[in-house]
Swiss-Prot record:
It comes from Prochlorococcus marinus (strain NATL2A). GO terms for biological process: translation. The gene is rpsF. The keyword Ribosomal protein applies. Belongs to the bacterial ribosomal protein bS6 family. InterPro entries: Ribosomal_bS6 (IPR000529), Ribosomal_bS6_CS (IPR020815), Ribosomal_bS6_sf (IPR035980), Ribosomal_S6_plastid/chlpt (IPR020814), Transl_elong_EF1B/ribsomal_bS6 (IPR014717). One of its GO terms (cellular component) is ribonucleoprotein complex. GO terms for molecular function: small ribosomal subunit rRNA binding; structural constituent of ribosome. SUPFAM superfamilies: Ribosomal protein S6. Residues 106-138 have a biased composition (Basic and acidic residues). This is Small ribosomal subunit protein bS6.
Length: 138
């Protein structure tokens, strides 16, 4: 076998857990991957976001993303640990074809610049209301 495949795991934690617990979950799942001789490439906390539909009576969730490279056996171990955790409300692992692209930081600099639209002054042929009033007074 030439090179180990790349994987990306995204999981959603309950929104009511404290930030320290979120960090402990991230460390816990990274350690599970390292014990299975898997290289953890990247881990990102995506933050609290609104869910598309309620999951276990939660309308929001804390999104966390793990990118790793391994032989594939680590996925079952990782997903089993997530399934047993009460704090994880949803998870998914996707096998990537090649190396994962490095995510770009989200900031206002990366947003396309909006061009300022200056209103053009157009004169109409019909007289305005003010002009009509002036004409009627004369």
């Amino acid at each position: 076998m030439s090179e180990q495949p790349y994987y990306e795991t995204m999981y959603i934690l309950r929104p009511d857990i404290p930030e320290e617990e979120v960090d402990s979950h991230l460390k816990k799942y990274s350690e599970i991957l390292e014990k299975s001789e898997t290289e953890v490439l990247d881990s990102q906390m995506r933050g609290k976001r609104r869910l598309a539909y309620p999951i276990a009576k939660h309308k929001e969730g804390i999104y966390v993303q793990l990118s790793h490279k391994g032989n594939g056996q680590q996925v079952a171990t990782l997903e089993r640990a997530m399934r047993l955790s009460e704090d994880v409300i949803r998870y998914i692992t996707v096998k990537q074809d090649g190396p994962l692209p490095t995510p770009k930081p989200t900031s206002k600099e990366n947003e396309p610049e909006k061009e300022e639209v200056k209103p053009t002054e157009e004169k109409t042929e019909s007289p305005s209301k003010d002009e009509k009033k002036e004409d009627s007074k004369e």
